[in-house]
Amino acid sequence: MALTKRIIPCIDVDLNEDGEAAVYTGVNFEDLEYTGDPVELAKKYNEAGADEFVFLDITASAEGRETMLDTVSAVADECFIPLTVGGGIRTRDDIKETLRAGADKVSINTGALQRPELIGEGAEAFGSQCIVISVDARRRFDEAGEHYVEVDGESCWFECTIKGGREGTGTDVVEWAGEAADRGAGELFVNSIDADGTKDGYDIPLTKAVCDNVPTPVIASSGCGSPEHMAEVFEDADADAALAASIFHFEEYSIEETKRSLDEQGIPVRL
């Protein structure tokens, strides 16, 4: 029997002008617009039948500040499905405090790329199942990469970026995903800066490149505009889970109708 695919709503959280946590959505990691309250959205998705929930503090790493753990704790109080929290996690103590605040898993991007040993430290202390390595990938059409795919008739590779997509690293996503898995990551969270917020569909070449080369479970993220896009990333790239934000936040589709649509298309989901 095929493994059940997971449907995961995600909130991108930042501090507003009053220093309060708020949810935002944007396009290509830019042009952010206020979307809602993180605690209210957590409660909504918990009751709606989501399989998991992701909370990303989208400026903690770039601003060099700590993750907003008070908000994480408030979200965890309303969330009785697995909760993954990312943003600003740089040390083993950061992992511990985030889990203590109520997270079931932590998502690490910048901190792991800057110090890869953090992956093994976290996996050894808390278990691989708690360690999700996030990659914010950007397409590069040059000869600096290692793993190339064809996109619209051109050869490209995918570069890992850090600090919310603000800085390139020169590191190939597929190479890094393999290293992260070898170091103890229990899951990979693959974001596409090029697809983010477009609602044109997931970056299939990116997701497939990671899934084909790394045995660790992969969460596909960025670009979802419909349940059909989720079906594509499950069938064409073999992702284990699909993450979406805007289509759920703005109630273009509910979790329930998304799952029913996938079920009708033969995708195994938890109804």
Swiss-Prot record:
It comes from the Archaea. This is Imidazole glycerol phosphate synthase subunit HisF. It holds the Pfam family His_biosynth. The gene is hisF. Its EC number is 4.3.2.10. Its main location: cytoplasm. IGPS catalyzes the conversion of PRFAR and glutamine to IGP, AICAR and glutamate. The HisF subunit catalyzes the cyclization activity that produces IGP and AICAR from PRFAR using the ammonia provided by the HisH subunit. It catalyses: 5-[(5-phospho-1-deoxy-D-ribulos-1-ylimino)methylamino]-1-(5-phospho-beta-D-ribosyl)imidazole-4-carboxamide + L-glutamine = D-erythro-1-(imidazol-4-yl)glycerol 3-phosphate + 5-amino-1-(5-phospho-beta-D-ribosyl)imidazole-4-carboxamide + L-glutamate + H(+). Keywords: Amino-acid biosynthesis, Cytoplasm, Histidine biosynthesis, Lyase. Pathway: Amino-acid biosynthesis; L-histidine biosynthesis; L-histidine from 5-phospho-alpha-D-ribose 1-diphosphate: step 5/9. Heterodimer of HisH and HisF.
